[in-house]
Regions:
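Basic, Lys/Arg-enriched alpha-helical interface segments
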Residues: 1-62, 72-76, 85-105
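Conserved catalytic cores of phosphodiester-cleaving nucleases, focusing on short active-site segments
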Residues: 79
Length: 105
């Protein structure tokens, strides 16, 4: 089922700081989200939050994460992105994505 993918302006600024190869992978994954409505493991993971928050998982000279959520049946919102430097995703970054999601709900 085709979906519309919206990207938060703040997420665009974060993603634009990433290396070109990472941005290309993000674009490819968001295109798959548009066409199929979802991604499979290991490329995505649902986070254990009260909100339906997911992360796109990218490996390229490090680990990168892009947080997104489903908003209704037809929209996906890209909320934030980061270069992950620790094994566990920082809770601060998850909370930031949740806060941004609440702005859309």
């Amino acid at each position: 089922m085709k979906k519309t993918v919206l990207v938060d302006d703040r997420a665009i600024k974060e993603i634009n700081k990433f290396p070109k190869a990472v941005r290309i992978k993000i674009r490819a994954y968001t295109d798959i989200l548009k066409e199929t409505g979802g991604l499979q493991k290991p490329f995505t993971k649902k986070l254990n939050t009260k909100l339906n928050l997911y992360e796109i998982r990218i490996k390229h000279k490090g680990t990168w994460r892009v947080f997104y959520a489903y908003c209704g049946k037809k929209e996906i919102i890209i909320l934030s992105a980061l270069h992950k430097k620790t094994q566990k995703t920082p809770l601060k970054e998850i909370r930031k994505a949740e806060k941004r999601l609440r702005e859309y709900l």
